[in-house]
Structure formats: structure tokens, C-alpha cells
UniProtKB/Swiss-Prot annotation:
GO terms for molecular function: magnesium ion binding; phosphopyruvate hydratase activity. GO terms for biological process: glycolytic process. PROSITE patterns: ENOLASE (PS00164). SUPFAM superfamilies: Enolase C-terminal domain-like, Enolase N-terminal domain-like. The gene is eno. This is Enolase. Binds a second Mg(2+) ion via substrate during catalysis. Catalyzes the reversible conversion of 2-phosphoglycerate (2-PG) into phosphoenolpyruvate (PEP). It is essential for the degradation of carbohydrates via glycolysis.
Length: 425
């Protein structure tokens, strides 16, 4: 047993200049584990509660001093002296202490910071990298990156309704090669957009945010850029979308204001089917709104056999929500965001449940990130085979890619790149 002797939460800034929680967990041996908590822009209503101060005189009401007080007060009192290696008990103790269904009393941002920092302290104490400590001896699969190179929706100030247009270098032989391929396409896209007279400003996740009128225009630019970089779309590199459709679901209709189109559920599914038929799209995230279960059923029936349908707002990394979706046959994949559920052990439970049901899992960042690269380790620890961590710019995104490169180097000949194994046949 190695006891926790101190826990300290502090207010730091995320990649959008908003406050977030960072936690240090200190062990009796002097080892320190540190973790910073991410924050989302397009958030699901079923997510665990991120505790903000609401004081308009500080950080426009977005301060997290209350969450830090939770860490430094009640959580410290409850966990002090406990064994840092008993992750499940640590997390359960915090969940019980909070006493709410969505962690709203202490704040999921407070609880998650402690949960992740404790795991990192335990890994350090064990002399193991985090991916090995969490995942065990068989953690060796490097994920295919979903690289968000054009931003729309809530992540950018442009008319594009779909939130993310991503490339997936499935044809690479290694994760480091996939990252290189992605970087080359990113730079090709920048030149292609610039040559066409578009701005090359970047959005929250590092992708470009040009003033394009439709999803098809965005996809055409990406296809051209893949070819310009010397790769074959549909062979070397596939495409993926995050529609974030809860953001444009209004009174039972899907209102794409930028494209000036409104769809019912069947119409939206036909729109996606047309895109899938025209472009090498292998993954669609949040194709329907979080509570539009009828829409999800239609979408899964229409495209589930050939496209990965990822539930983000639908499942919010919550084992109970995922179990409901599995029972009803909704989607076929779960997006995994540690701050949606608020503890490491619940996150791992959701991934395990997905895999046992034949669903894929995609480890994911949030639009508000920090230099913390924990999710890179968790992607390898869970062998989930896919990671979504933004574009090939902004150091808050690059930190995760760089950590994957390091992990692949550490694994050496044992490393296996997921590549085309993640594609639905």
C-alpha cells in the first residue's frame, strides 16, 4: 500500500483561455501525480456536471474555485491516507461523497482531476508508464488518429453546420507515419484554401475554419488536399464526420442554417447516405440528436452495416446510457471523453462494455484542452484503436500526438498500429 498524503487543486487556463481544474496527488513516498481537466463547447445534456463559480466578476462567471475547494476540502479529507493503487475504491468514495447522479455537488471537474492524478501518481510509484499501468501487459495497440482539419458548427465562426471534418490515415504502417501523413495533408489543405481565396484561421481544435457554404465544399477541399499531398482518398486516407446534430436539432427538425436546409429524420439519413456514397466516409459521429432515438434507429438501420456510427452526446461515456443504446441497437460505437462521466474507473467500464457488445470505442479530447496528454495513454491502455484529438496545429492538440509517438517508440517491436482493422467490412 502507498498512501495519499496530500491532494491540491488549482485553477489554471485551458486552450480557450477559460479556467479549468488541475490537481496534484502527493504520495507518502514523495511521488506526485498531476492531471488537468478538459472542457467541451458542444456538451450533451446527459453529461456529468462541470462545476463553475457563476461569479460574473471573475472570468465571466466561468471560474472553478468552487471545484478547487471541493478538491482541497471534502475530497482531500475523504481520500487522505487511502491506497493510491485502489482506483475503483478511490473513485467510488468520491462518487458516494458527492451523492448526486451527475456529480453536480462537488463537480465532475473536481472528481475527474483527482481520479486521473491518482492514477498518474500510482503509475509513477509503480515505475510504469501510464498506458502500461492502466492497460496491463497487453496494452500495445496504437490508435488511428481522427484528425479534425476543417472546423464548423460550435467550434468555428463560419456557416458550416457540421462541426468536424476529419481525415483518418488508415493506410499508414505506424502511428508516427499516420501523424506525418496527417500533417502533410494539413499543410496541403492550408495552401489549397489560400489559393482559392479562403482564410486559413483555425478553430478551437486547430482545424481550418473557412467560410464555406456546404459540407460538400469542405469535403471536396479535403479530397483535393489528400491527393495534393500524394495520397489516395479511400485507400491511404479515409474521411470521418462529427455532425454534432444536437446543436441544430430544433423542434423535431434538423435545421442546417448555413446550408439553408431543413430535414426530418428520414431526410437527414438520406443526406448522410448521399455523402457516404460520394466520399470515402467511414465514420459519422452524432448523426442524430442525443434524445432522438427514432432518428438513431433509422440511421443505424440505414448505414450501420458499412459506417461506424459514433455516439457522443447519445452515450456521454456513461455505462448506463451505453447499455440502453446497446439494448435498442442504436449506433455501433462510443466516443470516450473522460470528463463526460467524471472518473477513470467509469470510463474504463464504458470502454469494456462497448467492446463486449461488439461496439468500437474512440478516445477523445474536448474543444477546451490543456497540455495534459493523458488521453493518449488511455487510448493505448484500452486498445480502442482510434483517437480523436484535433488537428495538426495548436500545442494543446499536438501534445497528444507527440505522446503517441513516444509510446510507440517505448513499445518498439510490440507496437501494433490499428490501421485498416478499425474499418467496418
Amino acid at each position: 500500500m502507498t498512501a495519499i498524503i496530500d491532494i491540491h487543486g488549482r485553477e489554471i487556463l485551458d486552450s480557450r483561455g477559460n479556467p479549468t481544474v488541475e490537481v496534484d496527488v502527493v504520495l507518502e513516498t514523495g511521488v506526485i501525480g498531476r492531471a488537468a481537466v478538459p472542457s467541451g463547447a458542444s456538451t450533451g445534456v446527459h453529461e456529468a456536471c462541470e462545476l463553475r463559480d457563476g461569479d460574473k466578476q471573475r472570468y465571466l462567471g466561468k471560474g472553478v474555485q468552487k471545484a478547487c475547494d471541493s478538491v482541497n476540502g471534502e475530497i482531500y479529507d475523504a481520500l487522505s491516507g487511502m491506497d493510491v493503487e485502489d482506483q475503483i475504491l478511490l473513485d467510488k468514495t468520491m462518487i458516494d461523497l458527492d451523492g448526486t447522479a451527475n456529480k453536480s455537488r462537488l463537480g465532475a471537474n473536481a472528481i475527474l482531476g483527482v481520479s486521473l492524478a491518482a492514477a498518474k501518481a500510482a503509475a509513477e510509484e509503480s515505475g510504469l508508464p501510464l498506458y502500461r499501468y492502466v492497460g496491463g501487459a497487453f496494452a500495445s495497440t496504437l490508435p488511428v488518429p481522427m484528425m479534425n482539419i476543417i472546423n464548423g458548427g460550435a467550434h468555428a465562426d463560419n456557416p458550416i453546420d457540421i462541426q468536424e471534418f476529419m481525415i483518418m490515415p488508415v493506410g499508414a504502417s505506424s502511428c508516427s507515419e499516420a501523424i506525418r501523413m496527417g500533417a502533410e495533408v494539413f499543410h496541403a489543405l492550408k495552401k489549397t484554401l489560400k489559393d482559392a481565396g479562403h482564410n486559413t484561421n483555425v478553430g478551437d481544435e486547430g482545424g481550418f475554419a473557412p467560410n464555406l457554404k456546404s459540407a460538400e465544399m469542405a469535403l471536396d477541399f479535403i479530397m483535393k488536399s489528400i491527393e495534393t499531398a500524394g495520397y489516395k482518398p479511400g485507400e491511404d486516407i479515409m474521411l470521418a464526420l462529427d455532425c454534432a446534430s444536437s446543436e441544430f436539432f430544433k423542434e423535431g427538425k434538423y435545421v442546417m442554417a448555413g446550408a439553408k436546409k431543413t430535414y426530418d429524420q428520414k431526410g437527414l439519413v438520406k443526406f448522410y447516405a448521399k455523402l457516404v456514397g460520394s466520399y470515402p466516409i467511414i465514420s459519422i459521429e452524432d448523426g442524430c440528436a442525443e434524445d432522438d432515438l427514432v432518428g438513431w434507429e433509422l440511421l443505424t438501420d440505414a448505414l450501420g452495416a458499412k459506417v461506424q456510427l459514433v455516439g457522443d452526446d447519445l452515450f456521454v461515456t456513461n455505462p448506463a446510457r451505453l447499455s440502453m443504446g446497446i439494448d435498442q441497437g442504436l449506433a455501433n460505437s462510443i466516443l470516450v471523453k473522460v470528463n463526460q462521466i467524471g472518473t477513470l474507473s467509469e470510463t474504463l467500464e464504458a470502454v469494456d462494455m462497448a467492446h463486449k457488445a461488439g461496439y468500437t470505442a474512440v478516445m477523445s479530447h474536448r474543444s477546451g484542452e490543456t497540455e495534459d496528454s493523458t488521453i493518449a495513454d488511455l487510448a493505448v491502455a484500452t486498445n480502442c484503436g482510434q483517437i480523436k484529438t484535433g488537428s495538426l496545429s495548436r500545442s494543446d492538440r499536438i501534445a497528444k500526438y507527440n505522446q503517441l509517438i513516444r509510446i510507440e517508440e517505448l513499445l518498439g517491436s510490440a507496437a501494433r498500429y490499428a490501421g485498416q482493422t478499425i474499418m467496418r467490412r
